[in-house]
Design a protein with these regions (language model features):
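Acidic, serine/threonine-rich low-complexity disordered tracts
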Residues: 2-154, 160-169, 191-331
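Beta-strand/loop-rich accessory regions of lumenal/periplasmic or secreted enzymes
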Residues: 172-199
Length: 331
């Protein structure tokens, strides 16, 4: 594989694969009895929650994603994830300016296939401590390696390696904000009602140093009926915008059913519509077999404190009586 194609891989990874693997939003403790922080994404009460998604790009299926949580002896979580993208059209996810520089490679490789694996370590207080992801082009030695850690004083250290390129940065993470981006699918969002609003500070250590943070404004606006698991389900629609007004289309949207499960997440990237459509719990249970031998891919990464064997997962429904994921809520 030519070196320019590695650049394509990095760009594609930045827009899609790491949007899934590079974690989502930090939650405050929602209410007594609710898992704290990041744990609220992956547990239902005391039960870990496997979640699977079908990935759609411009209304075409291009892959699937899976996450599976495992509780540790100290009350924390290890979350393993897998993402597969098949025949992904490069011209729909790479910026036009980048296509100018990789035109010949793009003509020879109009679509790429990627497989990504990820791990996260979350402590008993719901704080993210480590994240690792590895993106591989099947049948090649080309890969993208991303890893990071967050210390007790909120210092974030992130490193990225791909195609002989190495990038590393460390920054201070403000309290009660998100790390990653709003494009990552969120499994649960309980406690919604029409008109509810809140703000979500988005912080990414990979963004330019002069502007590492952005504020998004979320609002529950309207309802829509979706077909899910052979049933018609009425969902609340959550819109995310860069400002308070509704003069521009939302940057991303979520469809949330009454029990708090997110059934669909949609965002627009470079004019292309990216959707994560939730799979039924039974499908997620079946897909969890993809994580067998998952940790063997991370022999070059620092170890995570986790048991060697994955537990049997529960598909207990989510009860939604708590507040949505947010840093600031306006009642």
């Amino acid at each position: 594989m030519q070196r320019p194609l590695v650049t394509v891989l990095i760009l594609a990874t930045a827009t899609l694969a790491n949007g899934w693997l590079f974690v989502t939003k930090i939650l405050p403790t929602l209410s007594p009895g609710t898992p704290p922080g990041y744990q609220a994404f992956y547990t239902t009460g005391s039960h870990p929650l496997p979640v699977a998604w079908t990935i759609m790009l411009n209304d075409r299926a291009v892959g699937s994603a899976l996450s599976l949580a495992e509780q540790t002896d100290d009350g924390g979580l290890i979350v393993r994830s897998n993402l597969r993208l098949e025949h992904l059209p490069v011209d729909e996810i790479v910026p036009a300016w980048a296509q100018i520089f990789i035109g010949n490679v793009l003509a020879a490789h109009p679509a790429i296939t990627l497989e990504a694996a990820g791990r996260m370590k979350i402590d008993r207080n719901g704080h993210l401590r480590q994240f690792q992801s590895l993106v591989q082009v099947p049948n090649t030695k080309q890969r993208v390696k991303l890893e990071g850690s967050i210390s007790d004083n909120n210092k974030v250290v992130v490193s990225l390696e791909a195609g002989g390129i190495h990038y590393e940065t460390d920054r201070h993470l403000p309290d009660n904000v998100s790390i990653g981006d709003e494009l990552s699918p969120q499994a649960t969002m309980p406690g919604l009602y029409p008109g509810r609003t809140w703000t979500v500070p988005i912080y990414s250590p990979l963004r330019p140093g002069h502007k590492p943070m952005e504020i998004l404004h979320a609002k529950v606006e309207g309802q829509e009926t979706l077909h899910f698991d052979d049933q018609l389900v009425t969902t609340d629609i959550v819109n995310y915008r860069s400002d308070f007004g509704d003069h521009h289309p939302p940057r991303s949207r979520m469809w949330v059913e009454p029990r708090g499960r997110v059934l669909k997440h949609e965002a627009v990237i470079l004019g292309s519509k990216l959707q994560f459509v939730r799979c039924p719990d039974e499908v997620a249970e079946t897909m969890s077999a993809r994580l067998e031998g998952h940790d063997e891919q991370f022999v070059d990464f620092p170890p995570l404190d986790a048991p060697d064997r994955l537990p049997v997962q529960s598909s207990t429904p989510i009860a939604g009586t708590t507040k949505p994921a947010s840093a600031t809520v306006t009642e």
